[in-house]
From Swiss-Prot:
Pfam families per UniProt: Plug, TonB_dep_Rec_b-barrel
Subcellular location: Cell outer membrane
GO CC terms, sorted: cell outer membrane
InterPro entries from the UniProt entry: Plug_dom (IPR012910), Plug_dom_sf (IPR037066), TonB-dep_rcpt-like (IPR039426), TonB-dep_rcpt_b-brl (IPR000531), TonB_rcpt_b-brl_sf (IPR036942), TonB_sidphr_rcpt (IPR010105)
Taxonomic placement: Bacteria, Pseudomonadati, Pseudomonadota, Gammaproteobacteria, Enterobacterales
CDD domains: ligand_gated_channel
Membrane-topology annotation of the record: Multi-pass membrane protein
Signal sequence extent: 1-30
Organism: Salmonella typhimurium (strain LT2 / SGSC1412 / ATCC 700720)
Keyword annotations of the record: Cell outer membrane, Ion transport, Iron, Iron transport, Membrane, Receptor, Signal, TonB box, Transmembrane, Transmembrane beta strand, Transport
Cell membrane among keywords: no
Protein name as it appears in the record: Ferrioxamine B receptor
Gene3D superfamilies named in the record: TonB-dependent receptor, beta-barrel domain, TonB-dependent receptor, plug domain
One annotated GO molecular function: signaling receptor activity
Length: 702
């Protein structure tokens, strides 16, 4: 169906249904307090797990909400850094590389580049290429980490969960901020944000945010450079109709490093020596990652007189990526590493569309909050790939300036993906009980077109995803729950014969409990789960073709505490236990643990605000992150050494000395400058963790 006809038909259908249905009044913009008979609950609100604003304590799924205050205080410069204190998450998959937001959820690394959503729509990157997209945290209001399958609402997604980003929207109260920052490794940059109404009637508001950042990479001489803007506009067309517009031009002319080095030489000595954690194995003239992202989108929402609402979200993106990389390819002799070359030129366009209708009806004593939706995704990526070889390099005494032995064209492809999904969700309330039922039907088409060899591989699949969950709200703030959900993950990955792999499928059982002390400002949660996924797409080395294996199982425990211990003291703590193993695979891998999945993780962040006295306005904070049990390869040949990282912040609000709106902050990550290896893909590719980072900033809010 042509896109224009699809949009018209689905929008018309939603409007007709919404106009015809009667029911109880339901607010267009959900509040944080919900009432059902005598039960009143006040809780932080999430929307990532249900697509509707729902109190977290009424949500029968593990959800973590990272506020802007949290990730700014911790000095996060990427989404993966912003979620590093969150349970169920491993954000150090490729160590010090800042090129992509790798976020491993519940041990599943196959979706670590494809599980991010912005304002409810999938980011639409192509993980079978180098066209993976990022959004800088400067443009975000909050981040929700939804753990466990989300296919019932979002279609294709990892069984480990999703990361739902919310962008900063225009406000009708005028204000803004200007920020300057600088630090070690030649870090420097600036950012601004300004918002306010455009008319006296407060019908139209606008926001313009922008930033630039530059740094020397840990792996000199590579650089990291970024420029981005986000203009947005909100128009209250009527008292019941609202339109939000946004754009996001983003440029990374220098994408830093993405290097991997052998286990011998990084984790353990090789020939009596260890490679420096700043060693660059490439060639400056042949190493570059240039990414250009351009997004435009809208969200239009209308509230009917009967309390039902209809909305449509759409985003279009176009990206261009250029990659040149010289990489290590194993030891040649006692000191020298072999080197290969990989290059790619990519142009991708995509559209994501979601039509939603929601409202409430009562059937006797049960209230039904219904959501009906139709969404559509269309992505096309044109890629041209090159490979080659470079002369070896001495890893302990490198000399640069080599020219390639050869570089040759090896692929010219077009990756196409289309998905149409129809979904229904019913959030039922009866006294203190909460029931959630959901179902979704997907039609997915994937094509890989090999232009170089005039061949193609196609895959057309239909799938049904389901979810059922039960939760009970005790009057003391305790809410136990049990849930079952399924996952559906088609990809454009191809095997050695060029055939598109069968979609991965998963199912999860999860049980947990949430606790919010009455009258307090704290949230505690605990969850246990088991996820089974079949048709796993995997490969031995980053340069190998993909292959499909039978089944992988992830079992784990997650604990989280977010607490304001007083008006001045805030605590964020988490613990994660993950046991993810191949259940049906080759005899060598059977029962082995998956890579990129720590067995144990623990973290805590404590901050203190001085409210009075000579030090009024001072903020002190520190965090600790512990990681244990990362395996070296799929055969579990070794286990990487555990590591502990310490972070800290010192901030000062200069308003206390009469400089209204002015503040300063110093962030230090990896305070002890610990040298460590964060993860390995195999014994040939291990990734150093980030060295110490020191950044000072000055901000003026007005």
């Amino acid at each position: 169906m042509p896109l224009e006809m699809f949009m018209f038909a689905t929008t018309r259908m939603a409007l007709l249904i919404g106009g015809a249905i009667g029911g109880a009044t339901f607010p267009l913009f959900a509040q944080e307090t919900t009432k059902n008979d005598t039960v009143i609950v006040t809780s932080p609100v999430q929307s990532g797990a249900t697509k509707l604003a729902t109190p977290d304590i009424e949500t029968p799924q593990s959800v973590s909400i990272i506020t802007r205050q949290q990730f700014e205080e911790q000095g996060a410069t990427s989404v993966r850094q912003a979620v590093s204190y969150t349970p169920g998450v491993y954000s150090n998959q490729i160590g010090a590389s800042n090129r992509f937001d790798y976020i491993v959820l519940r041990g599943f690394s196959d979706g670590s580049l494809d599980n991010v959503y912005l304002d409810g729509l999938k980011m639409m990157g192509d993980t079978n290429s180098h066209s993976s997209l990022v959004v800088d945290p400067w443009f975000l209001e909050d981040i929700e980490v939804v753990r466990g399958p989300a296919s019932v609402l979002y279609g294709r997604s990892s069984p480990g969960g999703i990361v739902a980003l919310t962008s900063r929207k225009p406000a009708f109260d005028a204000g803004g901020e200007v920020k300057l920052f600088a630090g070690n490794n030649n870090q420097r940059g600036a950012a601004f944000d300004v918002t306010g109404p455009l008319d006296d009637n407060e019908r139209v508001a606008a926001r313009l945010s922008g930033m630039t950042r530059y740094a020397d990479s840990q792996f000199t001489p590579l650089k990291e450079e970024r420029y981005a803007l986000m203009p947005s506009l909100t128009w209250r067309i009527t008292d019941r109709t609202r339109l939000d517009l946004m754009a996001y031009p983003h440029r990374d002319p220098e994408g830093g490093s993405h290097s991997g080095l052998p286990y011998q030489g990084t984790v353990v000595p090789y020939n009596g020596g260890k490679i420096s954690n700043t060693f660059f194995e490439g060639e400056d003239d042949y190493d570059k990652y240039d990414r250009r992202e351009n997004m435009v989108g809208y969200n239009i929402e209308h509230l009917f007189d009967n309390g039902w609402s209809v909305r449509q979200k759409l985003r279009y993106l176009h990206t261009k990526v250029t990659l040149n990389q010289v990489y290590a390819a194993g030891w040649l002799n006692e000191t020298a590493l072999n080197r290969g070359y990989s290059g790619s030129g990519e142009k991708m366009s995509a559209i994501a569309l979601d039509n939603q209708l929601d409202g409430s009806v009562d059937t006797g004593a049960i209230n039904h909050r219904l959501l009906v939706g139709i969404d559509y995704q269309d992505r096309s990526n044109h890629t041209t790939g090159y490979y080659g070889a470079f002369p070896p390099i001495d890893a302990f005494n490198p000399v640069y300036g080599a020219q390639p032995d050869y570089i040759t064209l090896y692929s010219r492809e077009k990756h196409k993906l289309r998905q149409t999904g129809y979904y229904l969700q019913d959030q039922m309330s009866w006294d203190r009980w909460r029931f959630t039922l959901g179902g979704r039907y997907d039609r997915v088409s994937v094509s890989n077109i090999d232009k170089l060899h005039d061949s193609r591989s196609d895959l057309d699949k239909n799938n049904v995803s389901t979810r059922a969950a039960l939760l009970y709200l005790f009057d003391n703030g305790v809410a136990p729950y049990l849930s079952y959900s399924t996952a559906f993950t088609p990809t454009s990955f191809a095997d050695e014969n060029g055939n598109v792999l069968e979609p991965m499928k998963g199912k999860q059982w999860e049980a947990g409990v949430k606790y919010e002390p009455p009258g307090g400002n704290s949230q505690f949660s605990a969850a246990v789960y088991r996820i089974n996924q079949t048709n796993i797409a995997t490969k031995e080395e980053p340069t190998d073709p993909y292959r499909s294996i039978g089944e992988i199982e992830s079992k784990g425990v997650e604990l989280e505490a977010i607490s304001h211990l007083s008006d001045s003291v805030r605590l964020q703590a988490a613990y994660t236990y993950t046991d993810i193993r191949y259940k049906k695979s080759s005899p060598q891998e059977q029962g082995k643990r998956a890579v990129y999945a720590p067995r144990n993780q623990a973290s805590a962040w404590l901050s203190y605000d001085v409210k009075s006295g000579l030090l009024e306005g001072l903020t002190l904070g520190s965090g600790i992150r512990y990681v244990n049990g990362v395996t070296s390869d799929r055969l579990n040949t070794h286990t990487l050494p555990s590591y502990t990282l310490v972070d800290m912040v010192v901030g000062y609000d200069l308003s206390s000395i009469g400089l209204n709106g002015l503040s300063a902050q110093l962030n230090v990550n990896n305070l002890t400058d610990k040298r460590y290896v964060a993860a390995c893909n195999s014994l040939s590719y291990c990734y150093f963790g980030a060295e110490r980072s020191i950044v000072g900033s000055v901000s003026w809010a007005f």
